[in-house]
Amino acid sequence: MNKEKIEKKTALITGGTYGIGFGIAKELLEKGMNVTITGRKEETTNAAAKKLADKYPGKVLGSFGDVRRMADMNKISKETRETFGNIDVLVANAGVGHFGSIEELTEEQWNQTIETNLTGVFNSVKASLPALIDSKGYIITVASLAGTNFFANGSAYNASKFGLVGFTQAIMLDLRQKGVKVSTIMPGSVTSHFAGHTPNDEDQWKIQPEDLGKMVVDLLEMNPRTLPSKIEVRPSMPPKR
């Protein structure tokens, strides 16, 4: 995949109804790609898809489902292929964050974090893989700097993101001989509603979702012989404390 061929390709973006996923969707649509965005709730997914489709008619599919369920991801993959013909890019972005000391963390919070941030990516990749092998496509996972840097109150989130970085690097080795490229983007602080945060004016120093969207475009337009496998992204000028 390169600059001349990105137009009219199809991307499936999990967790695409807001934040990072929505920002990536906007940038790919701006480049002429078809985009499927996913979310867990039908109403939210349809509303986000309509917002994009109003500007990019005929280029957007909203498909709801839970990445934790393989059956849901198989459905979403099928709907994407039926609508656009194939899947050329998978952006595995859906994620959750539960934070607190190991004494406070509940079994439910642990399971939801691991099942969404790690098992959900496995399900997304498995459901899309036949199409991606056929198209010699690109898998991009959205991890975090928490995938290589641990912090207090982050046991579940750290475990899920460390695991995601390892998973992505391993499948990169599995799939490169099949013509499928695999990268992981590891952002630091991003302006979004993630983990219950409400964006405000003080977030201007943070990475913006569209910044990561432009980075995905750069990866897709890069010379096919080049593969940045692990990309750490930090705000260039964090606030003074």
Spans of model-derived segments:
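The beta1-alpha1 cofactor-binding region of Rossmann-like NAD(H)/NADP(H)-dependent oxidoreductases
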Residues: E42-E43, F64-K75, E107
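Substrate-binding pocket helix/loop in short-chain dehydrogenase/reductase
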Residues: S101-I102, Q109-N111
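Active-site helix of classical SDR
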Residues: V125, S160
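Residue(s) in the substrate-gating loop at a strand-loop-helix junction
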Residues: S144
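C-terminal helical subdomain
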Residues: T184-I185, S192, D201-R241
